[in-house]
């Protein structure tokens, strides 16, 4: 996440997933729930809901009912739907929207508590966007659609009783045929727990120790950032320590994940507004990844190789220490706020392929399990170089993040394990199980998140870390031999 700004908490909470939108197929207006248990869909019209700061309009053609809701121009603007359920039950939620002003995000809040973020694709027509699942109580419930990015139109929501999740069909082996014994052992262990347990994780060893102080339990997984090994940072005096932290956690029986806030190889603005150490942001550099990859003869392509080779040195240290790594490069690419995603999906996928080839085939680094970190099929580099899928989700309420989980199920055809690689709020175990959101691990970001009661209260952390469903460091000892 890069978190001097995370990102000013400005609503960048879930990545775009425009391809998940499906053409509208309506036919019902607001319907009363059936008296007997039903598997049929129920649609609630937005204009019949409770409006706060929003208004009903009819200018956009194609709406259902008597109108639609617009006016999402303030953070507090929302629609509150009052919905009924004949029993405590899980439902698939979809939102019929028109994002006529560009790609958008909204926040869905269930019964005033847990929230999740949903992305809307830009378009000039009405579409039904899958919005995850909601666990309704027997009787009355509320579903709020809260502004977030704002500037979109809402026609209705539809609730359909969720079908039971089928058994996962996870690939039995890693893509790299030369994967070393440590990587294979870790992958086998992860397969053995997937869908049954979740690994508790934390970004940075310092904040893992904070969790131990707060809960009496230590995260099973620690994520480290190779950011300070970027050559454009090293030449300005940074000294990375994350490899040592990773080895420390591995030596006490833990599992290691790594990401890389890749400071751009060149073209850093280095101004008061955009200092050199923020050089992974698109708006802090003029480095053009598409141009750099356009020819192997240009100077910036050579700089890409230089940087990858510098990170290879650090990954080899972990390899030589027999530490397998859940390796998550080019994270959040589809967001566009990092330079590696600034030019669209094709250059990002090309860069990922270069990383894979350079690290695996050129350097022979075989202790890596490759983790991809975007939701949209347009950005997916392909099954052959991705072992695990993941999402970064920053939404308050300690919810199950079922929207993103279900998107990744579809992306990987349920053959890839799925991780919540970065979260702002640790998910509550009871909700994870109720929603059948079988995240492999979660890793809470550090300062301003794990130590912020608005995101992770002490009570919630203790609930999470003492749950039988959540694996902590003491509970995974000997995983290498399992």
From Swiss-Prot:
Keywords: Glycoprotein, Glycosidase, Hydrolase, Secreted, Signal
Use in biotechnology or industry: The addition of Man26A as a supplement to the commercial enzyme mixture Celluclast(R) 1.5 L and Novozyme(R) 188 results in enhanced enzymatic hydrolysis of pretreated beechwood sawdust, improving the release of total reducing sugars and glucose by 13 and 12 %, respectively.
CBM6 domain: residues covered: 42-160
GO MF annotation list: carbohydrate binding; mannan endo-1,4-beta-mannosidase activity
GO BP, one annotated term: substituted mannan metabolic process
pH-linked activity: Optimum pH is 6.0.
Glycosylation sites: 171, 300
Secretion signal span: 1-21
InterPro entries per the UniProt record, alphabetical: CBM6 (IPR005084), Galactose-bd-like_sf (IPR008979), GH26_dom (IPR022790), Glyco_hydro_26 (IPR000805), Glycoside_hydrolase_SF (IPR017853)
Cellular localization per UniProt: Secreted
Matches recorded under SUPFAM superfamilies: (Trans)glycosidases (SSF51445), Galactose-binding domain-like (SSF49785)
Enzyme Commission number, as recorded: 3.2.1.-
Residues annotated as domain GH26: 181-474
Principal location class: secreted
Regulation: The activity is completely impaired by Ag(+), partially inhibited by Zn(2+), and enhanced by Co(2+), Ni(2+) and Cu(2+) by 22.6, 14.5 and 20.8 %, respectively. Ca(2+), Na(+), Mg(2+), Mn(2+), urea and EDTA do not significantly affect the mannanase activity.
Record: active site: 332 (proton donor), 422 (nucleophile)
Class of the enzyme per the UniProt entry, highest EC level: hydrolase
GO CC terms in record: extracellular region
Thermal dependence, as annotated: Optimum temperature is 60 degrees Celsius.
Record family assignment: Belongs to the glycosyl hydrolase 26 family.
Function: Mannan endo-1,4-beta-mannosidase that exhibits high activity against konjac glucomannan and carob galactomannan, as well as a lower activity toward beta-mannan. Shows no activity against barley beta-glucan, birchwood xylan, and low viscosity carboxymethyl cellulose (CMC). Has the ability to hydrolyze manno-oligosaccharides such as M4 which is degraded slightly to M3 and M1, M5 which is mainly degraded to M4 and M1, and M6 which is mostly hydrolyzed to M4 and M2. Shows no activity toward M2 and M3 manno-oligosaccharides.
Protein's recorded name: Mannan endo-1,4-beta-mannosidase
Source organism per UniProt: Thermothelomyces thermophilus (strain ATCC 42464 / BCRC 31852 / DSM 1799) (Sporotrichum thermophile)
